[in-house]
Design a protein with these regions (language model features):
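PDZ/PDZ-like groove recognition
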Residues: 105, 239, 243-244, 248, ...
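A conserved glycine-rich beta-strand in the N-terminal activation segment of trypsin-fold
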Residues: 38-40, 76-82, 97-119, 144-149, ...
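Catalytic histidine site
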Residues: 46-58, 99-130, 178, 359
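Interdomain regulatory linker/hinge segments that flank or connect interaction modules
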Residues: 55-73, 214-217, 268-318
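Active-site substrate-binding loop(s) of clan PA
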Residues: 149-151, 169-197, 204, 288, ...
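Catalytic-histidine neighborhood of serine endopeptidases
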Residues: 60-64, 114, 119-156, 167-169
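N-terminal activation segment of mature serine protease catalytic domains
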Residues: 55-108, 122, 159, 182, ...
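Active-site loop architecture of trypsin-fold serine endopeptidases
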Residues: 100-105, 124-133, 170, 190-204, ...
Length: 403
């Protein structure tokens, strides 16, 4: 018996809740093929899979709608860690369908509580920032469908909490400590790419503390450009500090789970890199760290919204020399807000911030993302360079409010 068999108590025969694989009949294979060719086409819009919401937002057409496929174990003696992790976490991951008068889309989400609170992305429940008036349905891993409503959204970190209405109890996802991750750690992604519920892919942690910039889900999305985005837009943008993984992530994975080898949540999938056009996964995906996601989810469940730190300083990228102007080495303080957190901590204009809470800062975007992931009133440390000397300052972050 394998170690994973012992850990998750797989039986020699398919365990209860698992469906043995059956070879489809010729009639079934033909019917499936016809369905794929003639089914209703759905237009992908960014991270969520959906119909066109506004002019120019279409990226590609797909129609791979199928029934959910539970984790199938045909040979319990040879299960891998991927099978074990997927079997543990799959009941906690669901497919989310969102529709409005002007369009619709699909994403993923993870259950937070037994009574139906679920975490996903803001851009999933707002159809990439197009509307707040939506109808939401959630399809669980075993194919049951329930209505849901939005509890609160956090466009700053692209997270949202919804509440599923059901008399049954759900299986909450178990959180891991994302601050304990190492580059090279194994990862598993579960979600509904292209509408294919319960899809499992694997990879590794490719990088930590990566900062990406994406269109804000609180702003209308009227562009179809490429870049480091699941969704794009011509309006406001946000900076996100994320986990980078090479596990295959595609449109529809948004809001789904990124797991460790034990099937514990390490991140909420939010974006992929693409070169524009209709490209899917190229092995560069991003997830919001579980520690950040948990903090924001708890605040939204308690108050309907989440708080964010504010440094009270305008910053810009800082190069170490004119010859190396293409590479930023920190965040230079250009202007201080009178009475703000930075000024109170002793920061001066011209200082170059190189670390925030011990993590290297090489650009203004990285500092912005790091600060906004903290809650209002959080204590933090800044390492900065002033007149060639390195200083460490303690700061109590302000409240970003609606900024």
């Amino acid at each position: 018996m394998s170690d994973y068999n012992r850990q998750f108590l797989f039986e020699t025969k398919p365990a209860q809740g698992f469906t043995p694989a059956k070879k489809p009949t010729l009639r079934q294979r033909l019917a499936n093929r016809i369905n794929l060719l003639t089914g209703t086409a759905v237009l992908i819009v960014g991270a969520s899979l959906g119909a066109a919401i506004g002019a120019g937002v279409g990226i590609g057409v797909y129609n791979y709608w199928t029934r959910p496929a539970p984790v199938i174990v045909n040979n319990a003696e040879s299960v891998s860690w991927v099978t074990a992790a997927a079997a543990k976490a799959s009941p906690s991951v669901a497919t989310i369908s969102v529709s409005s008068a002007s369009g619709g889309g699909n994403g993923s989400g993870v259950f937070l509580t037994e009574d139906g609170y679920m975490l996903t992305n803001t851009h999933v429940v707002t159809l990439d920032g197009a509307t707040s008036s939506v109808k939401i349905e959630v399809k669980t891993y075993d194919g049951h469908i329930y209505p849901a409503t939005v509890v609160g959204t956090d466009p700053t970190n692209d997270l949202a909490v919804i509440k599923v209405s059901s008399p049954i109890k759900f299986t909450p996802v178990e959180f891991a400590d994302s601050s304990a991750l190492n580059v090279g750690d194994a990862t598993v992604a579960i979600g509904a790419p292209l509408g294919l519920s319960n899809t499992v892919t694997k990879g590794i942690v490719s990088a930590l503390n990566r900062t990406i910039q994406v269109a804000s889900a609180a702003a209308p999305d009227n562009s179809s450009g490429g870049g480091l985005q699941f969704y794009s837009g011509s309006g406001d943008s946000i900076n996100l500090r994320v986990i980078q993984t090479d596990a295959a992530i595609n449109p529809g994975n948004s809001g789904g789970a990124l797991l460790n080898q034990q099937g514990l949540l390490i991140g909420i999938n939010v974006a992929i890199a693409n070169a524009g056009g209709t490209a899917g996964s190229i092995g560069v995906g991003f997830a919001i760290p579980s520690n950040v996601a948990k903090r924001i989810a708890e605040e939204i469940m308690a108050t309907g919204s989440a708080s964010h730190g504010l440094l009270g300083a305008m910053v810009s990228d800082s190069a170490n020399s004119d010859a190396a102007a293409s590479f930023s080495v920190g965040a230079k303080v250009v202007k201080l807000t009178s009475g703000g957190a930075a000024e109170k901590a002793g920061v001066l204009e011209g200082d170059i911030v190189t670390k925030f809470n011990g993590v290297a800062i090489t650009s203004a975007s990285e500092l912005t993302a790091a600060v906004r992931q903290e809650k209002a009133g959080a204590k933090a440390t800044l390492e900065l360079i002033r007149a060639g000397k390195t200083l460490t300052l303690s700061v109590v972050l302000g409240d970003a409010g609606n900024q």
